[in-house]
Amino acid sequence: TYRRDDSNLQKIVPGYYYRSDETGYTNGSGCGNEVASDRPMVQKLIVDSLIYWAKEYHIDGFRFDLMGVLDIDTMNVIAERLKEIRPDIYLYGEGWNGGPSSLAEEKRAFKASAKKMPGIGMFNDDIRDTIKGSVFYDDHLGFVNGGTHLENALRYGITGAVAHPQVDYDAYGSRPWAKEPGQSINYVSCHDNYTLWDKLSVSCPEASEEKKKAMNRLCAAIVFTSQG
């Protein structure tokens, strides 16, 4: 949450709504705190809020930032309750967290746990970085801007991170992470990091504008024709 020590949650029941360890608040969000979604009344607060927004405001989809901060059980309860209201509701999020968390790794709503959360989508950062290069390194190249030996990684992304006989999974923990293609949110850029054009410009400073336009079109073609 934006506030921590003086937040309404901390004032209601001090030490309950946030995770902590012997050093104080844990920081799975990267913002100084993380809600303890695995505790019954925290889960209830989250679920009840979502139900209210879905019923009263007719919201037809929810995106969960840093979904890895939340636990698998809570996400499954969310999906179950919201699909009772609207079976075609969209539920997806970032399948990672922003810092060290005290929540056991096997309980986190990570991308690696997607098969335990059917009907919930995850951003596919594998295809994002394969297409244009890592978002963390300016000069890192992807498939469209000159990167090499990326054919298998691209097939992995195009299939929507599900099992396929033409993909070698040894580089990905020997297994695909998605239960079904619909869990893979395919994208090449978003609100974080460089825009696609800026990434292509900084990674290929000698490329002409026409060349970068062609790269941009290839990025779109890959995303639009991938499963997911």
Question: Which role fits each region the language model picked out?
Answer:
Residues 1-57, 67-86, 90:
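Substrate-binding/active-site clefts of carbohydrate-active enzymes
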Residues 57-58, 227:
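Short loop/turn motifs at secondary-structure junctions
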